[in-house]
């Protein structure tokens, strides 16, 4: 059980953020605030969410994309991170697993995920 002061602090951290509902298998576009020296810029990172873990302030998710030269790039983001400017859900994926780590071994068409019918 957490201390009530810690719970209040964590609740304040969560209140200001507007996070869309997404799951593993969804294709996301993240706008990440990057600080280089005294300048800041926004960089987009688009990929498939392959896992979510934790809850509350400690919740994180992993996004995987295929970069240049067919190299897989995975990044782990805290959901309530200050560096995340926005999270946009581009596609809803139809998957039967909560963790899609098997996509690491797949290449090309085998790594595709079916789109969820509405």
UniProtKB/Swiss-Prot annotation:
Task: State its role.
Answer: This protein is located at the 30S-50S ribosomal subunit interface and may play a role in the structure and function of the aminoacyl-tRNA binding site.
Could you name the domain of life of the organism this protein comes from?
Bacteria
Q: Which organism is it from?
A: Campylobacter lari (strain RM2100 / D67 / ATCC BAA-1060)
For this protein, the record's PANTHER family field holds: LARGE RIBOSOMAL SUBUNIT PROTEIN BL19M, RIBOSOMAL PROTEIN L19
State the Gene Ontology terms under molecular function. structural constituent of ribosome
Family note: Belongs to the bacterial ribosomal protein bL19 family.
Q: What is this protein called?
A: Large ribosomal subunit protein bL19
Q: Which GO terms describe its cellular component?
A: cytosolic large ribosomal subunit
Q: Which UniProt key words apply to this protein?
A: Ribonucleoprotein, Ribosomal protein
Task: Give GO terms for biological process.
Answer: translation
Looking up Gene3D superfamilies in the UniProt record yields: 2.30.30.790
**Record keyword Lyase present:** no
Among the Pfam families in the record, one is Ribosomal_L19
Q: Which PROSITE patterns match?
A: RIBOSOMAL_L19
Keyword Disulfide bond carried by entry = no
